[in-house]
């Protein structure tokens, strides 16, 4: 299910290093949110607990993985790699239970530098266990198009690999540079492996966010920073200054490496106010993760124009619920205006067109507080807001989006 400590997204490791360097004493709490209609079972919760206690707790960095990280990820400092070599997941940091509504209540609590690696690992485990203990038909008697009812898991994986190859060829034919970003909501480890086997045949694949598969398939591990870096910073320095402090601190830690700035933590307008000339020049580009992507392209170009920066020397990385069709349209819209690339996730590792009878889980695990101070994510899409109601109300007021009584 989780085969290696590297079976995780690169940005969790890069953020872990930054937290260790700048905020080693910070305490964090994360919470799971199920945005969909799927429900869980007692059997599911018991199996998840077993996986945490018996499997994930035993993961550790091997000597070979240690050497590979040092060679392929030179931005990870030797002191951090030594820390990671000795890192162990602590099951006691994870609390899980089944609610009366058969939903999953999951909380992760502990030092920020320790708990930061749980998010992707737990989401991948939740997704795979759901499709193992609750919706089981897909891997033995699936009714997916082109797959017979008597299909075995092997034949499903083979058919799925062909589907992914078709998607990859569409992206390649249209010149779309893209990375695989699908670890957190993958249907299973085996299916994720099949996805990568297919995608490495595509010339415009630039890499994968999953460090284990980057190593296995000889592609580039891709990733920079996630929302939690900025969210956590807001609790430590104040929300009004969080974007600026977060991105200046990131530069201090990585000296210009990993230079894609995430824009929507407190809404993109708040971000652009904080992205001054120095930061706009230092960062290679911006990542779009919510809101209308076409409006975002225009806003980014406007921002660079005001700064006297040629947008054709910068890049937008799109990562919001993308599929091949959306990527192709965005590529055409950006042509001649600004460079672009795509981080494509669930539509590769848990494609809803292929698995029509059992759609992927719509779930997140988000940072809830740092040192007991609630944090929020505002986003450019209202349905993606996370945080306590009062904290959201105050945050929207601070960034100028709403009045306190709205």
Curated annotation (Swiss-Prot):
GO terms for MF: nicotinate phosphoribosyltransferase activity
Superkingdom, taxonomy of origin: Archaea
Enzyme Commission number(s) from the entry: 6.3.4.21
Swiss-Prot/TrEMBL catalytic activity: nicotinate + 5-phospho-alpha-D-ribose 1-diphosphate + ATP + H2O = nicotinate beta-D-ribonucleotide + ADP + phosphate + diphosphate
Processing and modification events after translation: Transiently phosphorylated on a His residue during the reaction cycle. Phosphorylation strongly increases the affinity for substrates and increases the rate of nicotinate D-ribonucleotide production. Dephosphorylation regenerates the low-affinity form of the enzyme, leading to product release.
The entry's keywords: Ligase, Phosphoprotein, Pyridine nucleotide biosynthesis
GO cellular component, one term: cytosol
TM helices/strands, residue ranges: none
Pathway: Cofactor biosynthesis; NAD(+) biosynthesis; nicotinate D-ribonucleotide from nicotinate: step 1/1
Biological processes annotated in GO: NAD biosynthetic process via the salvage pathway
InterPro entries: N/Namide_PRibTrfase (IPR041525), NAPRTase_N (IPR040727), Nic_PRibTrfase (IPR006406), Nic_PRibTrfase-Fam (IPR007229), Nicotinate_pribotase-like_C (IPR036068)
Modified residues (Phosphohistidine): 227
Pfam families: NAPRTase, NAPRTase_N
Membership in a protein family: Belongs to the NAPRTase family.
PANTHER family according to UniProt: NICOTINATE PHOSPHORIBOSYLTRANSFERASE
Stated role: Catalyzes the synthesis of beta-nicotinate D-ribonucleotide from nicotinate and 5-phospho-D-ribose 1-phosphate at the expense of ATP.
Name of this protein: Nicotinate phosphoribosyltransferase
Species this protein is from: Methanosarcina mazei (strain ATCC BAA-159 / DSM 3647 / Goe1 / Go1 / JCM 11833 / OCM 88)
Gene, per the UniProt record: pncB
């Amino acid at each position: 299910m989780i085969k290696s400590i590297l079976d995780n997204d690169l940005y969790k490791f890069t953020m872990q290093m930054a937290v260790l360097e700048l905020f080693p004493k910070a305490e964090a709490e994360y919470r799971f949110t199920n945005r969909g209609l799927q429900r869980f079972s007692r059997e599911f919760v018991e199996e998840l607990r077993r996986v945490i206690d018996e499997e994930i707790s035993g993961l550790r960095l091997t000597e070979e993985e240690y050497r590979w990280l040092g060679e392929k990820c030179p931005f990870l400092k030797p002191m951090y790699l030594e820390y990671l070599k000795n890192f162990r997941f602590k099951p006691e940091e994870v609390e899980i239970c089944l609610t009366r509504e058969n939903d999953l209540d999951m909380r992760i609590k502990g030092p920020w530098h320790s708990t930061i690696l749980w998010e992707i690992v737990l989401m991948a485990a939740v997704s795979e266990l759901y499709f193992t203990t609750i919706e089981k038909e897909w891997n033995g008697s699936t009714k997916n198009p082109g797959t017979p009812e008597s299909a075995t898991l092997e034949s499903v994986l083979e058919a799925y690999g062909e589907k992914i190859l078709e998607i990859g060829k569409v992206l390649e034919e249209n010149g779309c540079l893209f990375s695989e970003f699908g670890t957190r909501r993958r249907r299973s480890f085996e299916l994720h492996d099949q996805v990568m086997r297919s995608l490495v045949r595509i010339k415009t694949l630039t890499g994968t966010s999953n460090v284990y598969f980057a190593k296995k398939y000889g592609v580039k591990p891709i990733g920079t920073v996630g929302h939690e870096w900025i969210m956590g910073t807001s609790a430590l320095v104040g929300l009004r200054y969080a974007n600026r402090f977060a991105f200046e601190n990131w530069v201090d830690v990585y000296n210009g490496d990993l230079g894609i700035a995430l824009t929507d933590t407190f809404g993109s307008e708040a971000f652009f106010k904080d992205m001054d000339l120095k930061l706009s020049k230092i960062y290679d580009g911006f990542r779009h993760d919510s809101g209308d992507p076409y409006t975002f392209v225009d806003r980014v170009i406007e921002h660079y124009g005001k700064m006297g920066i040629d947008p054709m020397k910068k890049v937008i990385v799109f990562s919001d619920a993308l599929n091949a069709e959306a990527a192709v349209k965005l590529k055409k819209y950006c042509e001649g205006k600004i460079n672009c690339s795509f981080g494509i996730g669930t539509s590769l590792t848990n494609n809803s067109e292929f698995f029509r009878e059992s759609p992927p889980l719509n779930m997140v695990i988000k940072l809830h507080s740092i040192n007991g101070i609630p944090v929020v994510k505002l986003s450019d899409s209202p349905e993606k807001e996370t945080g306590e109601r009062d904290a959201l109300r105050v945050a929207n007021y601070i960034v100028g989006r709403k009045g306190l009584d709205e």
